[in-house]
Swiss-Prot record:
Residue ranges of coiled coil: none
Pfam families: Sdh5
SUPFAM superfamilies: YgfY-like (SSF109910)
One of the GO BP terms on file: succinate metabolic process
Localization of this protein: Cytoplasm
Protein name (database record): FAD assembly factor SdhE
Alphabetically ordered keywords of this record: Chaperone, Cytoplasm
UniProt keyword Membrane, yes or no: no
Family annotation (InterPro entries): SDH (IPR005631), SDH_sf (IPR036714), SdhE_FAD_assembly_factor (IPR050531)
Family statement: Belongs to the SdhE FAD assembly factor family.
Cellular component, GO annotation: cytoplasm
Stated role: An FAD assembly protein, which accelerates covalent attachment of the cofactor into other proteins. Plays an essential role in the assembly of succinate dehydrogenase (SDH, respiratory complex II), an enzyme complex that is a component of both the tricarboxylic acid cycle and the electron transport chain, and which couples the oxidation of succinate to fumarate with the reduction of ubiquinone (coenzyme Q) to ubiquinol. Required for flavinylation (covalent attachment of FAD) of the flavoprotein subunit SdhA of SDH and other flavinylated proteins as well.
Primary location group: cytoplasm
């Protein structure tokens, strides 16, 4: 039997990765949860691996910082000021 290298699976081809991403998306603030849940309901099946990487970066933020970005009170800065994060953030803001 051959070992399968799961690191080569994309987000779309691996349901476990999708489940982990949804689990990481759970937030402490209801407002963030609502926005993120709507986002997943609309875009989950269309997410690229770059989108998943950007979401992962956003989900590492404290809840209040994420809410400020989602509500456009602030714009991404530093390591978050990259096209992939800005793209995902625009999708999150649109839902």
């Amino acid at each position: 039997m051959t070992a399968v290298n799961t690191s080569t699976f994309s987000h779309q081809s691996d349901p476990h990765r999708r489940a982990r991403l949804r689990w990481r998306a759970r937030r402490g603030l209801l407002e963030n949860d609502i926005i993120v849940e709507r986002f997943f309901n609309r875009y989950e099946t269309e997410l690229s691996d770059d989108d998943v990487g950007a979401l992962t970066q956003l989900f590492e933020l404290p809840d209040n910082d994420l809410m400020d970005l989602l509500l456009a009170r602030k714009e991404p800065e530093g390591a978050l000021d990259v096209p992939s994060v800005r793209h995902v953030l625009s999708l999150l803001r649109a839902v």
